[in-house]
Amino acid sequence: TWKYNVKARVAGVASASQNSTFTINGNNVNPTQASTTYKLLGMGRTHKLDFNPSSKKVTSNYKGKSTTMNMSQQAFDDLSLEVQIRQDLLNGKFSGNYYMAKKDKIEKTPFKKSGSTKITVPAGTFNTVRVDRVHDDDSRSTSFWLAPSLDYMPVKVSQINDGKKMDLELTKIN
């Protein structure tokens, strides 16, 4: 069993915390639980997901509402999907076709490889493969720069949503 945690904050204004628990069998990532908490000026919301691979169902809890959804295909939370994409790139099996568990539905979430480039972040300079999420909405974009030398660990993530841009860059490798 693996646990993946991400925390980000803008001093005094906003914070985000994501947690995912999953197993890896061969090339397949199987999430079991996930949660995402966003806080803005002290007010926050948490979205929880519980995956049941044996019944092929996922239960979403948000704002006191519980929704159980059928998984006809393996579905992922944000973090377990990132790990599945890494596994697929490592094993030459990247298809770009993935499913995300949302608050009230399971949504097909396509990705595409957008070439290779060398980028510099605080942790160093890396040759990367860029993977873009394909959004229906032109005002949104999400790009990941993954370093093959680090087993496709993301060294940069860039997201634009309604004109607001957020960049995350790798600062240190332990």
What are these model-derived regions, one by one?
Residues 1-53, 91-174:
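Acidic, serine/threonine-rich low-complexity disordered tracts
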Residues 43-88:
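Hydrophobic, well-structured mid-protein blocks that either form specific transmembrane helices
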